[in-house]
Amino acid sequence: MSTIEESVKSIIAEQLGVKKEEVTNNASFVDDLGADSLDTVELVMALEEEFDTEIPDEEAEKITTVQAAIDFIKESKK
């Protein structure tokens, strides 16, 4: 597992108050991890801060799974 992947999963677990084991790559923030719209906004802000990147609103709306978040961060770091 890459460092980015581990970091993203840790942030998601912390922000959503779930066990790290529940944060699988294909987990949906809303359907699987119980996030609401405020949780997802706070999650995007936490990812932006941790990885010093900007996630535009139109991109943030597409980030609905753990893997989508990992992919976006990896792309932003290229």
From Swiss-Prot:
Record Gene3D superfamilies: ACP-like (1.10.1200.10)
Coiled coil residues, start to end: none
Gene Ontology terms describing biological process: lipid A biosynthetic process
GO molecular-function term, one example from the UniProt record: acyl carrier activity
Superkingdom, natural source: Bacteria
UniProt keyword list: Cytoplasm, Fatty acid biosynthesis, Fatty acid metabolism, Lipid biosynthesis, Lipid metabolism, Phosphopantetheine, Phosphoprotein
InterPro entries for the chain: ACP, ACP-like_sf, PP-bd_ACP, Ppantetheine_attach_site
GO CC annotations, alphabetized: cytosol; membrane
Positions carrying O-(pantetheine 4'-phosphoryl)serine: S37
Pathway: Lipid metabolism; fatty acid biosynthesis
PTMs per UniProt: 4'-phosphopantetheine is transferred from CoA to a specific serine of apo-ACP by AcpS. This modification is essential for activity because fatty acids are bound in thioester linkage to the sulfhydryl of the prosthetic group.
Pfam families documented for this protein: PP-binding
Residue span, Carrier domain: 2-77
PROSITE patterns: CARRIER, PHOSPHOPANTETHEINE
KW Lipid metabolism (keyword) present: yes
Cellular location(s): Cytoplasm
Physiological role: Carrier of the growing fatty acid chain in fatty acid biosynthesis.
PANTHER family hit by this protein: ACYL CARRIER PROTEIN, CARRIER DOMAIN-CONTAINING PROTEIN
NCBIfam families cross-referenced by the UniProt entry: acyl_carrier (TIGR00517), PRK00982.1-2 (NF002148), PRK00982.1-3 (NF002149), PRK00982.1-4 (NF002150), PRK00982.1-5 (NF002151)
Protein name as it appears in the record: Acyl carrier protein
UniProt source species: Wigglesworthia glossinidia brevipalpis
Lineage: Bacteria, Pseudomonadati, Pseudomonadota, Gammaproteobacteria, Enterobacterales
